[in-house]
Amino acid sequence: MRKYFGTDGIRGIAGESLTADLSFKVGKALGKLLTEKKEHPKVIIGRDTRISCDMIEQALTAGLTSTGVNVMTVGTIPTPAIAYLTKTIETDSGIMISASHNPYQDNGIKIFGSDGFKLTDDQELEIEYLIDNTDKIKNASFEKIGKLYSGNELTQKYVQHIKQSISGDLSGIKIALDCANGATTGVAPFIFGDLEADIETIGCKPNGININDNVGSTKIDTIANFVKENNVDVGFAFDGDGDRVLAVDSKGNIVDGDKIMFILAKHLKEQGELKDNMVVSTVMSNIGFYKAIEENGLQSVKTAVGDRYVVEEMRNNDYSLGGEQSGHIILMNYATTGDGILTAVKLTNIIKTSGKSLEELAGEVSIYPQKLVNIKVIDKKSAMEDAEILVECEKVEKELEGNGRILLRASGTENLIRVMVEASSDELTDKYCEQVAKIVREKFEVK
């Protein structure tokens, strides 16, 4: 049973469950592992715009340097940039301080290996053990204490990497960017501007407490309304740490991760760059996505929910494209993790080179009506194993008869049960979703 790590690193309310003390212990635990392999290993640390990032960064740095690790801080930067820099400047580990799409009160610690990929389960468990035994970790002797460096200039390496992912520019396309008052604020507008796109921005004035506050990919209506009101060709909304993105077309229609994956897959297939014509998705992808994939001579494989599972499947089989409906899109030829800016640049380039609007490109996917209900529960494990709930799910699945589906899953980061139904009409999704959700609420909901 994990004590600290969830499906996407360590997360908690800053100052409560995620304290300076815990952050120091995480740094010391990671430092212990790294210094066992070499003297003065290097760790790069990035952050989003939350007010608590200072506290966590300084505590992590103290823990790392106390064991002899040299630390380079790069300031506010997207998560995929940390993953990219960790690999390309040959550091021994990378850390991103962020709680992604969560409100500013939360924060988190994501750790990457020297290859730019997130840690394995075994590595995380090893760190957990050391966190609880930091009193047994020796401090470095005075002459071997680690040093702290500033690496703010390294952001430019990531900027160049993204710009070089396409040939040509993005001139002639009017784009709106919603940076969620988060980690993409100082980078995304700069990249699109350099690529000669005509850009408008919102959510680019972080103040420490407004990250994801009515902006970003979890508040997609904000960018949708902006696009409609300002005669924009395409809008992109990033999440707080920039590892995912959702799009909207010129009419304000949402283009989610499923549609983005389909557009990218079709393009990559035409370019001969899609390994085995395969797209890796999760069980949350819409039935309409799978039908469009099949109709266009593409293949797909499903994983559990979570970008780490998508990446694992891609690495095991050397696949080049994968992602989630929520907007985590992994282009493995360019990145080791989901990258919202890279995805947005690639999608805009397809719009320009194809001569088609985003409406036309996304219109090939007919999305089935979908309803998702989140229920805060007392015990998500018991809810997932409850016989009455499971029987009701089987009953719904049978009634849908292959023309829809029901999915019951527990959140990996919160004490939530998610009930998702897809069917041929909104009436059916509402009916079946409520049918199951009612039982979950009656038996397990937090009152």
Give the positions of each predicted feature.
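An N-terminal, well-structured beta->alpha segment
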Residues: 1-62, 66-67, 145-175, 381, ...
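Gly/Ser/Thr-enriched, mixed-charge loops and adjacent short helices
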Residues: 13, 107-228
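N-terminal small/polar loop signature for handling phosphorylated ligands or for N-terminal nucleophile
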Residues: 32, 39-107, 190-248
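Short glycine-rich phosphate-binding loop at a beta-alpha junction
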Residues: 40-48, 72, 174-176, 278-283, ...
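Glycine-rich phosphate-binding loop
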Residues: 92-106, 227-249, 253-254, 298-339
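Proline/glycine-rich low-complexity loops and linkers
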Residues: 125-159, 164, 250-323, 330
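Phosphate-binding and adjacent anionic-ligand microenvironments
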Residues: 271-447
